[in-house]
Amino acid sequence: MKVLIKNGTVVNTLGEQKADILVDGEKIVAIGTELPEEADRVIDAAGKFVLPGGVDNHAHFAGLNTDGVTTFAEYDTTYINALGGTTTIVDFCPNEPGMNLVDSVNYRLNVRAKGQAAVDVALHANCTDFTDETIGEIPKLVEMGVPSMKLFMAYKGTPLYMDDAKLISCMKAAKECGMTMMVH
């Protein structure tokens, strides 16, 4: 379906400009003035700002307790994000119980979020159960489109805690494949 948004004040990295926007499906295909009205739907945005969707780069749809127990908010609540103009969330994905990080990411995207989220969902890996296979998973996560991982130096004496040797080994593996590491 083609949608034409006409006469709005478009705000982007170039600043503000009066312009029309043509959307085909989920993709912006043209921004300009006096675009032809060859669309299934025309929206008059005169007197209004047209902004890109927001990105929430720090979402927690799984709450982690220091005992390693995970509590969940479900992705069907993301309609609230959409109502506020946020079109993408980047959720932290801890190890699901009994799963490695790669399987946890697949589960999160293909089971928990699939068909539930009202916005686009991306993930930060959240290593909450370091094992012998964790280092080998880091490049696989990058290949899957997961650009970052969160590690914990806080919460010593809990399952979340990562000692210096594990932390450094994760950081070295991340450097080799271009993954960003975050430390809490």
Outline where the language-model segments fall:
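Histidine-rich, glycine-flanked metal-binding segment
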Residues: 1-4, 9-52
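Divalent metal-coordination and catalytic microenvironments
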Residues: 8, 21, 26, 47, ...
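Residues that line or immediately flank small-molecule/substrate-binding pockets and catalytic motifs
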Residues: 12, 93, 153
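Glycine/Thr-rich phosphate-binding loops of Rossmann-like dinucleotide-binding domains
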Residues: 18, 31-32, 65, 99, ...
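Metal-associated gating/positioning segment near the N- to mid-region
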Residues: 45-116
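Histidine/acidic-residue-rich, glycine-tolerant segments that coordinate divalent metal ions
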Residues: 96-107, 111-184
